């Protein structure tokens, strides 16, 4: 029950356990899958790491100068030189200065002067390449076991952790007591790593444009440089003052860390953990659940009394969680659970924790269920010790329909075409079709539920014809669009 504590939660239900199921996992969200005769599973991406990114360039933002040396010549005596000029670790500058009788020269005029100083970088930052094949995704899969300590648990101890990389995109997770689930995932970071550089400065990192980083007016070293001393463009952090006869002062600029922090305002900051860089993004995965099995399906039904350990309440997803305790004998056993209408004639709602079981007497069990909108009764156990609980779920199916549609529209606005992967239940939708299904699929399903596909096609044709014959331009365009969407969704649903 890991997903209970996460606000952004998707449900994938009604899928055959023997088929591939398409889901999309993103940071900050959780996906719950439910299939017939299969355990309910929660999937969450908890971490995306960039392993061993290659260094493109190092840039120095704080330096110091030592061992300053100056050599000068009188007019007409040639250009001065220093042996230190051959050392690439030094920064040097040639200048001209006024000379004459007052400073040791027999002639008046311009004499040469050269000054060198040892340049040492104290602090630097690195720009790193990140290749998609270096990304590692950590996924936690947690079955709905009903155990008390597993509700909303974020430690990873009660789920199975999987490491997904482009090199090992197909992996299997062994869930103790439930069998094996197979995952085939492909990363969708939404980033163009050819144009992006990871700028790492001390214990912080940012995503910046590659060309912006290369244009920084700071001393730099190639990423392949192993000596770390032969800085290029050292003069960008050094100022040579005006020379006076045989003397010239050279100073180094102060730390540029503050200027860099200001320049990076608004850039996407990347978190770091144990030297690895943590990314966002999402994974498109296909699940195969044919090797999964329900735990305790052969157990008999519990015949004793149950009691409510903690008052049940509605979660932020519209579901409810009930904590009960079995006081009877015969454990382990299955917990009888159903949701019925007020007349007690029809079974309603959906049990998310499939086949909840009691492993031992007096041990609390958590059950998650999705009751229908309005009034209903929750029945736990069998007579004579049966629990009958009244529940009122606020809202309506129409409101939920529009809420789901708005969620799909927001995803498309934020993520672009990558959002078309969300909400896929194994159907084949491509290009614009995925967008139409994502945004309008819920409304369409509610409006035309129970209508045959031929009638849907006919309605779409009629609406399109009316729009084409309308004299009002705005009405014509609106009706044609509605008709085309109706035709498309009608054809896709039938297919």
UniProtKB/Swiss-Prot annotation:
Out of the domains of life, which is the source? Viruses
Which ranges sit in the Cytoplasmic compartment? 467-472
Q: Gene3D superfamilies, from UniProt?
A: 1.20.1280.260, 2.60.40.350, Tick-borne Encephalitis virus Glycoprotein, domain 1, Viral Envelope Glycoprotein, domain 2, Viral Envelope Glycoprotein, domain 3
Q: What are the disulfide bonds?
A: 3-30, 60-121, 74-105, 92-116, 185-285, 302-333
Record keywords, A-Z: Clathrin-mediated endocytosis of virus by host, Cleavage on pair of basic residues, Disulfide bond, Fusion of virus membrane with host endosomal membrane, Fusion of virus membrane with host membrane, Glycoprotein, Host endoplasmic reticulum, Host membrane, Host-virus interaction, Inhibition of host innate immune response by virus, Membrane, Suppressor of RNA silencing, Transmembrane, Transmembrane helix, Viral attachment to host cell, Viral envelope protein, Viral immunoevasion, Viral nucleoprotein, Viral penetration into host cytoplasm, Virion, Virus endocytosis by host, Virus entry into host cell, Zinc
Per UniProt, what is one GO molecular function of this protein?
Answer: protein dimerization activity
Pfam families named in the record: Flavi_E_stem, Flavi_glycop_C, Flavi_glycoprot
Those parts of the protein on the Extracellular side are 1-445, 494-495
UniProt feature coiled coil, ranges: none
Query: Does this entry carry the keyword Zinc?
Result: yes
Membrane-crossing ranges are 446-466, 473-493
Q: Which residues are glycosylated?
A: 67, 153
The keyword Membrane is assigned to this record: yes
Gene Ontology CC terms: host cell endoplasmic reticulum membrane; membrane; viral envelope; viral nucleocapsid; virion membrane
Annotated GO biological process: clathrin-dependent endocytosis of virus by host cell; fusion of virus membrane with host endosome membrane; symbiont-mediated suppression of host innate immune response; virion attachment to host cell
Report residue spans for region: Fusion peptide.
98-111
NCBIfam families for this protein: flavi_E_stem (TIGR04240)
Its UniProt miscellaneous note says: Isolate M3 comes from a patient with dengue fever.
For this entry, the protein name equals: Genome polyprotein
**Organism of derivation:** Dengue virus type 2 (isolate Malaysia M3) (DENV-2)
């Amino acid at each position: 029950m890991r997903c209970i504590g996460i606000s952004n939660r998707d449900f994938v239900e009604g899928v055959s356990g023997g088929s591939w199921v398409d889901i999309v996992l993103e940071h900050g969200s959780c996906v719950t899958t439910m299939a017939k005769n299969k355990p309910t599973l929660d999937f969450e991406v908890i971490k995306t790491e960039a392993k061993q990114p290659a260094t493109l360039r190092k840039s120095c933002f704080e330096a110091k100068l030592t061992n300053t040396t100056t050599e000068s010549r009188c007019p007409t005596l040639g250009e001065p030189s220093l042996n230190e000029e051959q050392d690439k670790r030094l920064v040097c500058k040639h200048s001209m200065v006024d000379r004459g009788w007052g400073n040791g020269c027999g002639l008046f005029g311009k004499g040469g002067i050269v000054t060198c100083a040892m340049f040492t970088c104290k602090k630097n930052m690195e720009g790193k390449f990140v290749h998609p094949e270096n990304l590692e995704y950590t996924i936690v899969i947690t079955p709905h076991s009903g155990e008390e300590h597993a509700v909303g648990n974020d430690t990873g101890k009660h789920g199975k952790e999987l490491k997904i990389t482009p090199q090992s995109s197909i992996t299997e997770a062994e869930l103790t007591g439930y069998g094996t689930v197979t995952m085939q995932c492909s990363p969708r970071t939404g980033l163009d790593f050819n144009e992006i550089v990871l700028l790492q400065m001390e214990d912080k990192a940012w995503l910046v444009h590659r060309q912006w980083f290369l244009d920084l007016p700071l001393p730099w070293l190639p990423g392949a440089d192993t000596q770390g001393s032969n800085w290029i463009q050292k003069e960008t952090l050094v100022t040579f003052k005006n020379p006076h006869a045989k003397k010239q002062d050279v100073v180094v600029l102060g730390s540029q860390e503050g200027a860099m922090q200001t320049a990076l305002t608004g850039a996407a900051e990347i978190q770091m953990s144990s030297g690895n860089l943590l990314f966002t993004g999402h994974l498109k995965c296909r699940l195969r659940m044919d090797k999964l099995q329900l735990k305790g399906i052969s157990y008999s039904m519990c015949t004793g009394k149950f009691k409510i350990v903690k008052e049940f309440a509605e979660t932020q997803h519209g579901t409810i969680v009930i904590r009960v305790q079995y006081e009877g004998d015969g454990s382990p056993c299955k917990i009888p659970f159903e949701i019925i209408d007020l007349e007690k004639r029809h079974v309603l709602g959906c049990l998310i924790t499939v086949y909840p079981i009691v492993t031992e007497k007096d041990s609390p069990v958590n059950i998650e269920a999705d009751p229908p909108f309005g009034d209903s009764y929750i029945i736990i156990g069998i007579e004579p010790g049966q629990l009958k609980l009244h529940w009122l779920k606020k809202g309506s199916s129409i409101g939920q329909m529009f809420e789901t549609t708005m969620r799909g529209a927001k995803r498309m606005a934020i993520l672009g075409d990558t959002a078309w992967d969300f909400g896929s239940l194994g159907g084949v939708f491509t290009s614009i079709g995925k967008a139409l299904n994502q945004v309008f699929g819920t409304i369409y399903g509610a409006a035309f539920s129970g209508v045959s596909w031929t009638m849907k096609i006919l309605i779409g044709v009629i609406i399109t014809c009316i729009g084409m014959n309308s004299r009002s331009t705005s009405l014509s365009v609106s009706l044609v669009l509605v008709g085309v969407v109706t035709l498309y969704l009608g054809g896709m649903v039938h297919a």
